[in-house]
UniProtKB/Swiss-Prot annotation:
Keyword Magnesium: yes
Keywords for this protein: ATP-binding, Coenzyme A biosynthesis, Cytoplasm, Magnesium, Nucleotide-binding, Nucleotidyltransferase, Transferase
Disulfide bonds: none
Organism name: Prochlorococcus marinus (strain MIT 9303)
Lineage per the UniProt record: Bacteria, Bacillati, Cyanobacteriota, Cyanophyceae, Synechococcales
The keyword Transmembrane is assigned to this record: no
Assembly notes: Homohexamer.
The enzyme's E.C. designation: 2.7.7.3
Gene Ontology BP terms: coenzyme A biosynthetic process
Binding site for ATP: S8, F9, H16, G87, L88, R89, E97, H122, S123, F124, L125, S126, S127, S128
Protein name: Phosphopantetheine adenylyltransferase
Gene giving rise to this polypeptide: coaD
Top EC group: transferase
Pathway where it operates: Cofactor biosynthesis; coenzyme A biosynthesis; CoA from (R)-pantothenate: step 4/5
Length: 157
């Protein structure tokens, strides 16, 4: 099976990486779909995020990285995946993700969204939080893959 894992990944966290690894173990292949949203100004370019994901997932068989804009279900159909993979950190994530899953299902009834609970030790992580800690010189080594930590240190120093 092929799973689509969409997100901005700005930056990739260890929580994201854990989901990618678990997705590969469960489904065999994970297509990491990096959102290119012209309405947002990301900390890292699309190419930088691609590189971060490629380096961080080099040990994983079955990972591919693509970019997309627009609807997730269009991306899923275009890339011939079987399901959409999402992670849940807390109940607030569940409510938000369930609404998106229902919307996706209304647009493409043949696509399922599978939720995986985030590992407890990653449940506090968010890309926004990581950037904030890095911006103020805090230790982020336990939050992101090494390649991302290096890029964040360069960005904020």
């Amino acid at each position: 099976m092929r799973a689509l894992y969409p997100g901005s990944f700005d930056p990739l966290t260890l929580g994201h990486l854990d989901l990618i690894e678990r997705g590969c173990a469960l489904f065999g292949e994970v297509v990491v779909a990096v959102l290119s949203n012209p309405a947002k100004t990301p900390a890292f370019t699309l190419q930088q995020r691609f590189n971060q994901i490629h380096v961080a997932t080099a040990h994983c068989k079955g990972v591919s990285v693509i970019s997309f804009d627009g609807l997730t279900v269009r991306c899923a159909r275009h890339n011939q995946v079987d399901l959409i993979l999402r992670g849940l950190r807390a109940m607030s994530d569940f409510e938000y993700e369930l609404q998106i899953a229902h919307t996706n299902r209304s647009l493409a009834p043949d696509f399922e969204t599978i939720f995986l609970a985030t590992a407890a030790h990653h449940s506090f992580l968010s890309s926004s939080m990581v950037k904030e800690v890095a911006r103020f010189g805090g230790n982020i080594d336990h939050m992101v893959p090494e390649v991302v930590a290096q890029d964040l240190h360069r960005l904020f120093n």
